[in-house]
Amino acid sequence: MPTHPLSRNRFTGFSLVELLVVVAIIGIIGTIAVPAVGSLMKGSALTQAANLITDQAALARQYALSRNRVVEFRFYKIADPEQPGEDATKPSTGYYRAFQFLEIAEQGIPNPVGKIVTLPNSVIMNPSDTLSTLLGAASADRKVTTITANDPELPRGVRKNYEYVSFRFLPDGTTNLSPTGTTNGLWFLTFHILGDIKKATDNQPPPNFFTWMIDPVSGSSKILRPGLAVKK
């Protein structure tokens, strides 16, 4: 049988122009996809933080009720040495990034019963008076900057280089937060990505955030987040 030589074009590769077109298309897709992925990661970190604060507050309240004990819920201010301008030995240079609940013994000594929960690396609690009444001037009498021998050491090299603000769950499930006063009974925290701190003002959070609010009388809490249903 006669045979035919294979077509030369069958083994021809891509031309330089074709390769450049492919590279350009990949670049365009990358430009579109990277911001979207970044936004998804930020949203995921905030969702994780919302679940953490809600779950731990519920556990602390349940512990107070079931054990008939006073439980202190602390918000820790710590510095991250990997962040520019922050010094691990100076908590004043850091942000509120962790929380924990402790049983208060009859002698007033705190006994850690809840684990120390650290927020995802990119998430912080905004320290503004108006965005976080639990951390601002209204909570000045519950802010501790001098750590004592009875206070626990924090992990990850923090030790006792931290400050904290706290409130308490009472044995009946209520809190020691005032239902009136300067906050009109509105006690809350605003969480957002650290990188968005410059997008926030004293009165306005950045575009991507959530607010955790606690009822001073019932001790129950809920999450408020733009575009999402209220989570209790």
Task: Name each model feature, range by range.
Residues 20-36:
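Alpha-helical hydrophobic helix detector
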Residues 2-7, 11-14, 32-62, 66, ...:
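N-terminal helix-rich module
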Residues 12, 18-21:
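Internal alpha-helical transmembrane segments of multi-pass membrane proteins, especially GPCRs
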